Amino acid sequence: MGFFSGEYDCTVDAKGRMVLPARIKSNLPDIDAGNVVLTRGFESCIVLYSQTEFKKIYSKVSGLNEFSEEYRVFQRNFFRGINEVELDSNGRLLIPKMLMAHAQLEKDITVVGMGNRVEIWSPDLYQKFLIQDSSEFAQLAEKYLAPTKKE
């Protein structure tokens, strides 16, 4: 699995296509052969997964109890908006209109490597979801990254 990192300013053309940044593209597993999965993010963004990474998530979702009403509601919303997309010879991918609307994308976009996935944002919305206060960021780092007694 590739490790996606970095923050990139990109554009979407009139047909809804974007060029995947070279650094992101180079980290896609060869086994996926230029095919990626786009889905709605929990926030107002689009999430891009390699097919290899998405299969791991799919396995978790498909292993849940289908007889649970709560699970079925989750599953319905999870699968809503998932699109398998192929990169063309120029490294472009077509963003479906429904996902463009979900993320409120226009011409300018921000692409953010997030380790095992990539987020695609409207630049203005992206800024709203960033922490502006360094002490708040430090508190979250302490909460989630500080060693536990087991370590």
Curated annotation (Swiss-Prot):
It comes from Cytophaga hutchinsonii (strain ATCC 33406 / DSM 1761 / CIP 103989 / NBRC 15051 / NCIMB 9469 / D465). Keywords: Cytoplasm, DNA-binding, Repeat, Transcription, Transcription regulation. This is Transcriptional regulator MraZ. It holds the Pfam family MraZ. One of its GO terms (molecular function) is transcription cis-regulatory region binding. GO terms for biological process: negative regulation of DNA-templated transcription initiation. Residues 7-53, 82-125 form the SpoVT-AbrB domain. The keyword Transcription applies. GO terms for cellular component: cytoplasm; nucleoid. The lineage of its organism: Bacteria, Pseudomonadati, Bacteroidota, Cytophagia, Cytophagales.
